[in-house]
């Protein structure tokens, strides 16, 4: 597919023109780190991100065709900006019933959701993992049956949520059954909103697993997480079933939560990525996925030969193909200890917690990255002692968190209220102010406005959270 790169072309032409830069930014194109000649602002011809009529509009139209959406909008401030705009738009499109607006959301949401709730002043009803689910802070599989039940329960209270919000893929690589969830939402007249920050590449797999293709009304993609894009580059995608389609309204929502000085370096990166995606990227993506699947099988075969208590590489139909999630229990250690061992072998992971290590690959990783990782893990496997016990099932910890959860005030009241930081072990009975997170994955254990319970303290201590903010 032939693809233009109008933003890249304009900026390069300007950089070569010798024009006196009597405008921002202050470096005037003089190289300090090397990128400065390409770093500009909204000069004549450069267009304007939140009211585009020229090169940005053309580039976004290219992205829209590539992703197959009703419209794909650029963000230079990551999925966090897109999440806030998406929720604002869902609120704007919802019928007004005189009640406080409520969102139905899976509990493993990024803290950006809570910040949006504080800014927009809506309530959240949580979808929790089943009591039998293996406990993990990052995971919250939602079934169509569970969603139907939650919607029915809200309806019995005379309430309809303005949206259903799920994270897919999650930080451990788990994916939701989006077609089934979308069907439930469609039947109930509620938009499905997806945090797809980790899944921009899904559109370019042969089977097209992108949320918009699977029925989501809106989703955010962090292009920078899985595509060759500079940090901060993201998309807000609208499906044809989005509750708001007016372009000015969408751009207004993005502008509400964005800087008036968007980075043209990031915009060029998003623009250049269009050409990559229109080229041989899908073929390279298939090759990368195949290499990772081969690595998973090889590692799990070796783990089975060593009689490890669990497979080393997490696998299954509900796992995205581009994350390699390692279960450190296979080696008899914690995820953080495994990450340290890999770091000594010059392998830096994306995320580690007491149980898991997450490694993110893309087609930009050279073959030697795969080879170095396999060699390091095979060396660790060779040292595994016989008779390791199976890891303890932690599902009870999360069931207790759900059972004990009590919302004492609104999220907005908690986030904006007077607060103080105290040690976790002294927080029992206090009300959580700012979300208590470790980052990554930036998923709260205790939610703003909730009482700090014994179960919350157990989980915070397990995930290394030593202090938290509570209301005074």
Report each predicted region and the residues it spans.
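Conserved N-terminal alpha-helix of the aminotransferase class I/II PLP-enzyme fold
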Residues: 36-81
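Conserved C-terminal alpha-helix-loop-beta "cap" of PLP-dependent enzymes
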Residues: 300, 304-454, 459-463
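General small-molecule cofactor/ligand-binding pocket signal
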Residues: 73, 125-127, 350
């Amino acid at each position: 597919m032939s693809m233009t790169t109008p933003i890249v072309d304009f900026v390069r032409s300007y950089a070569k023109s010798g024009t006196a830069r009597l405008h921002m930014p202050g470096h005037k194109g003089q190289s300090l780190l090397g990128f400065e000649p390409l770093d500009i602002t909204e000069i004549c011809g450069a267009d304007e991100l939140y009211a585009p009529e020229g090169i940005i509009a053309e580039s976004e139209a290219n992205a829209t065709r590539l992703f197959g959406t009703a419209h794909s909008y650029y963000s230079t401030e990551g999925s966090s900006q897109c999440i806030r705009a998406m929720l604002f738009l869902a609120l704007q499109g919802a019928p007004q019933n005189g009640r406080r607006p409520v969102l139905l959301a899976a509990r493993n949401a990024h803290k950006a959701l809570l910040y949006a709730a504080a800014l927009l002043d809506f309530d959240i009803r949580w979808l929790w993992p089943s009591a039998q689910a293996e406990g993990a802070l990052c995971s919250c599989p939602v079934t169509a049956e569970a969603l139907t039940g939650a919607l029915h329960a809200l309806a019995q209270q005379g309430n309809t949520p303005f949206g259903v919000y799920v994270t897919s893929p999650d930080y451990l690589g788990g994916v939701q059954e989006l077609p089934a969830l979308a069907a439930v939402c469609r039947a109930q007249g509620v938009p499905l909103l997806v945090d797809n920050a980790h899944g921009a590449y899904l559109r370019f797999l042969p089977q097209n697993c992108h949320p918009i293709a699977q029925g989501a009304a809106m989703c955010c993609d962090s292009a920078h997480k899985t595509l060759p894009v500079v940090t901060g580059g993201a998309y807000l995608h609208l499906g044809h079933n989005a509750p708001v389609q007016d372009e000015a309204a969408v751009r207004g929502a993005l502008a509400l939560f964005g800087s008036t000085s968007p980075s043209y370096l990031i915009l060029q990166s998003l623009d250049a990525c269009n050409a990559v995606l229109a080229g041989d990227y899908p073929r390279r993506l298939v090759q990368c996925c195949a290499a990772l699947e081969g690595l998973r099988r090889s590692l799990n075969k070796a783990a089975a030969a060593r009689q490890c208590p669990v497979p080393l590489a997490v696998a299954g139909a509900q796992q995205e193909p581009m994350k390699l999630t390692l279960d450190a229990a296979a080696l008899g250690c914690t995820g953080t200890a495994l990450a340290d061992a890999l770091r000594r072998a010059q392998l830096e992971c994306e995320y580690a917690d007491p149980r898991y290590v997450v490694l993110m690959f893309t087609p930009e990783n050279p073959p030697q990255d795969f080879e170095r990782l396999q060699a390091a893990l095979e060396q660790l496997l060779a040292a595994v002692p016989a008779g390791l016990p199976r890891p303890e099932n932690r599902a009870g910890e999360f069931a207790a968190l759900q059972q004990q959860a009590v919302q004492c005030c609104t999220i907005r009241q908690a986030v904006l209220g007077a607060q103080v930081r105290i040690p976790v072990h002294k927080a029992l009975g206090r009300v959580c102010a700012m979300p208590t997170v470790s980052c990554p994955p930036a998923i709260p254990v205790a939610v703003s406005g909730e009482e700090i319970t014994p179960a919350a303290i157990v989980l915070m201590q397990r995930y290394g959270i030593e202090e938290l903010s509570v209301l005074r």
